[in-house]
């Protein structure tokens, strides 16, 4: 069963809001970043990757965000346009803020890390006055991610977008996307993540991310079922808890749970798995698929992306996912 109801006859299937940055992925693998000499540039940021993935799968997608007034900002906007993402609501920063950079290190498939440069970044300067109610009400769904909640005025802009979505029956997806380097403390993070989750229809995160959100609670011991049920007293209809190589579990308000597996692949790097999973999972739900079917799409998409060098460039089409699922071994 798919418990989500999407409004018909809206020009957008999905609008994402939040982080737009640049990934610089190491070309030399099996070595530390200190010894890496060359990198390849890609568009990055969790909501950007998810929007790109959704557009590749055929969804009509838009974006609300802010980019720097320089070559990097123009690179990001141009790439989104090339991928058929509406950029009418991407603002240009006029304060001298820069594009966030993420340098990746690929020592081995099991040992990957990211070095982030997030000081004075343009995406966190998105102002509430730059969030259009008319734009949001034209969409079936809104995607928010946790990084955009890290600082004002982006934080308030996201909460305003949430209010507009709730007002106009736009289904809200919350991808937790916890990045500790943009926050002052775990307590601060937990406060704002919980406030956002309370207004979301679908919450997607890792077990570790949900643990962080529960820091302020007096749980002697938490588990996936307890975590999911907490949100069903608010707006949540689906809570997805990811367990890396052990797959994921989706819980629904009616008490059901669905376990999703993974597809065997040759892993190059681990980052990008969550974004590619979310994009295909959201696509499946918007297309009306049952939750287990949407989870299978998500698992297949994640396996494809972790076998490739990039995140955004590697986001697969529907045909590529179907072909992969026909031949790859599924581990449940």
From Swiss-Prot:
Q: In which pathway does it act?
A: Polyol metabolism; myo-inositol degradation into acetyl-CoA; acetyl-CoA from myo-inositol: step 5/7
Which residues are in coiled coils?
none
Note the superkingdom of the native organism: Bacteria
Q: Which reaction does it catalyse?
A: 5-dehydro-2-deoxy-D-gluconate + ATP = 6-phospho-5-dehydro-2-deoxy-D-gluconate + ADP + H(+)
Gene3D superfamilies reported for this sequence? 3.40.1190.20, putative 5-dehydro-2- deoxygluconokinase
Q: What does this protein do?
A: Catalyzes the phosphorylation of 5-dehydro-2-deoxy-D-gluconate (2-deoxy-5-keto-D-gluconate or DKG) to 6-phospho-5-dehydro-2-deoxy-D-gluconate (DKGP).
Q: Which family does it belong to?
A: Belongs to the carbohydrate kinase PfkB family.
Q: What is this protein called?
A: 5-dehydro-2-deoxygluconokinase 1
As recorded in Swiss-Prot or TrEMBL, the protein's gene is named: iolC1
């Amino acid at each position: 069963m798919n418990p989500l109801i999407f409004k018909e006859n809206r020009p957008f299937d999905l609008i994402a809001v939040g982080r737009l940055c640049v990934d610089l992925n190491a070309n030399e693998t099996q070595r530390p970043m200190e010894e890496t000499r060359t990198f390849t540039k890609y568009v990055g940021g969790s909501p950007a990757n998810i929007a790109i993935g959704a557009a590749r799968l055929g969804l009509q997608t838009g974006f609300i965000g802010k980019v720097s007034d320089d070559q990097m900002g123009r690179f990001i906007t141009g790439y989104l346009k090339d991928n058929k993402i509406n950029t009418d609501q991407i603002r240009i920063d006029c304060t001298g803020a820069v594009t966030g950079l993420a340098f990746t290190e690929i020592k081995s498939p099991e040992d990957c890390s990211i070095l982030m440069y997030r000081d004075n970044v343009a995406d966190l300067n998105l102002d509430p006055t730059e969030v259009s109610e008319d734009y949001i009400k034209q969409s079936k769904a809104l995607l928010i991610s946790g990084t955009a909640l890290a600082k004002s005025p982006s934080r308030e802009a996201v909460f305003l977008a949430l209010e507009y979505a709730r007002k106009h029956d736009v289904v809200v997806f919350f991808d937790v996307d916890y990045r500790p380097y943009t926050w002052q403390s775990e307590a601060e993070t937990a406060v704002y993540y919980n406030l956002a989750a309370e207004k979301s229809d679908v919450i997607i995160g890792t077990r570790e991310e949900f643990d962080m959100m529960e820091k302020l609670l007096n749980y002697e011991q938490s588990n996936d079922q307890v975590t999911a049920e907490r949100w069903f007293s608010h707006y949540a209809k689906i809570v997805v808890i990811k367990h890396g190589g052990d797959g994921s579990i989706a819980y629904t308000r009616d008490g059901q749970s669905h376990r999703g597996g993974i597809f065997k692949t040759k892993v190059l790097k681990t980052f990008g798995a969550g974004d590619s999973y979310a994009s295909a999972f959201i696509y499946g739900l918007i297309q009306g698929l049952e939750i287990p079917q949407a989870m299978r799409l998500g698992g297949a998409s994640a396996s494809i992306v972790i076998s490739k060098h990039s995140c955004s460039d590697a986001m697969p089409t529907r045909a590529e996912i179907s072909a992969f699922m026909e031949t790859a071994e599924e581990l449940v």
